[in-house]
Amino acid sequence: KKYMLTSGMSGYIPNRSGSAVSGSWEEPFVSLGNPHVNDDSRASFNSQISKVFRVEGTDQLIAMADRWVPDYPVDAHRADLFERAIAAHFEPEKYHVLPEEKRELMNSPMLQSANTSKALYVWLPIRWERDRPKIDWLDCWRPQLP
């Protein structure tokens, strides 16, 4: 099987991740949903997955994620606002963003204004639940050793 972990399209602002599986690279992928478990921020623990590593000599996978704008934490309200704003661009008759919400969006770190020199990384292990990748928040953990 081939697995894919994805991020939405909100520039440097974190968003909900997705996971998908396929029998091969040539077949369609089927969505498995958000791999982040109990993520109250709805923003992938305020990060965007950029790479998955296998710990050499083990079966353990580690997700490395960028936290581009650590000074701009995303909570469920902000996540909803960004999701609606992006959706409204493609389906304006279905999704709506109020003028005050647009102002809030315009005050967020944009591609031109985000200070990415402050970026951090989030490293979390991937566990498997019935052939689905799951990522839990852990304040502290150690990788498996061979």
Short names for language-model regions:
Residues 1-146:
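Carbohydrate-active catalytic/glycan-binding domains of CAZyme proteins
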